[in-house]
Design a protein with these regions (language model features):
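Non-catalytic, mostly N-terminal accessory regions of nucleic-acid modification and defense proteins
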Residues: 1-220, 289-301, 306
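Glycine-rich nucleotide phosphate-binding loop and flanking beta-alpha elements
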Residues: 47, 322-323
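Conserved S-adenosyl-L-methionine
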Residues: 202-317, 322
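Conserved small/polar residues in nucleotide/adenosyl-binding loops
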Residues: 326-329
Length: 329
């Protein structure tokens, strides 16, 4: 087990370093360093989703064709079922097909068609990342094609399936949902440290969150039963508190011989951090929980509480205390 954990950590570090180096190699003369995240984070999300959807791509396209033929208006549920995921893409493109596409404006048009083919939940994440605003700049600087090529590099595997050689032996191990979530969180941490003028607004140190989780759960540890619990963060940022608190509650319940199911809920006013939080949950395979995260510039918890009628079993939060209350919309 210890050896496997070491392998997992080595794999995660290798992938994180690889993606980090893409930013330095491709974006150095195109963006100021503090803006690398605007491209790299959504591209990491795209590559993982693309890899996850690869196995069911044909089934989704067939289902889409059938639904259109029968003039079915509400297609989301059926397409999710065909994909076997909480998301899907109905465009004819994959990143691999885009890699073989022509350069320049043709690649731009094909790439936009690919993005527009994603399910509404992924579209929202990309919109909150303002990713479409980056595309023309990437095309004009002749970087878009190289980025696609880099993220498809055969020496790195962002897929949940292993890469095998011609003899069927595993060349690169699979990257499970927890692994890609850890990679994504590591990239976020590095970007926050690299551009730390506002890092505190987006990131609470993990050891602090772990202490907060203990203060939240330990006083009621003996009362935790094998049941379903809800956990809420009204200023959830990138979702780190929810994730750590969820892990802590599972661990505590296990220590007492209990098995719990946990539903996460959160609200976040910053577009980018909301996008990161939702993307992180999708990458971890927690699509249902991602639906419980709401946010955006018009979603202040103070003036536009999205869970006004809900009650929760636990709440954990670290709101931006330096923000004047009257500046909240």
């Amino acid at each position: 087990m210890h050896k496997k954990q070491q392998q997992d950590q080595s794999q995660i570090k290798w992938i994180s370093d690889f993606i980090w180096n893409i930013a330095d190699d491709r974006l150095r003369d195109v963006y100021v360093r503090g803006k690398y995240r605007d491209v790299i984070l959504p591209f990491t999300v795209l590559r993982r989703l693309d890899a996850v959807l690869e196995a069911t791509k044909d089934a989704v396209l067939e289902r889409k064709k059938l639904l259109d033929a029968h003039k079915v208006v509400e297609q989301d549920g059926a397409l999710r079922m065909a994909a076997g995921q909480a998301f899907y893409n109905v465009s004819e493109f994959t990143l691999a097909k885009l890699k073989a596409s022509a350069a320049g404006q043709r690649l731009r048009d094909d790439f936009i068609a690919y993005l527009d083919g994603f399910s509404p939940n992924v579209q929202e994440i990309l919109a909150k990342f303002s990713f479409h605003n980056q595309i023309q700049k990437l095309v004009d600087s002749h970087v878009l094609g190289y980025l696609i090529e880099d993220f498809l590099d055969p020496e790195v595997n962002l897929s949940p399936l292993p890469v095998k050689d011609a003899d069927g032996r595993i060349k690169l191990p699979p990257l499970d949902n927890h692994g890609i979530g850890t990679v994504f969180e590591e990239l976020i941490r590095r970007f926050n440290e690299d551009n730390n003028e506002e890092a505190g607004e987006h990131f609470t140190p993990r050891d602090v969150v772990q202490l907060m989780a203990k203060l939240l759960f330990l006083p009621v540890a003996e009362r935790i039963e094998s049941s379903t619990y809800s956990l809420y963060d009204g200023s959830c940022g990138t979702g780190g508190m929810l994730t750590v608190a969820e892990e802590s509650l599972h661990e505590l319940a296990g220590q007492h011989g209990k098995e719990v199911s946990i539903h996460l809920f959160g609200q976040e006013i910053s577009d980018e951090t909301y996008a990161i939080c939702k993307a992180d949950l999708l990458l971890k395979g927690e699509g249902e929980e991602a639906e419980n995260i709401v946010g955006g510039a018009d979603k202040s918890t103070l003036s536009a509480d999205q869970f006004r009628s809900r009650e929760f079993d636990f709440m954990i939060s670290n709101p931006p205390y330096g923000c004047l209350l009257y500046t909240s919309p």
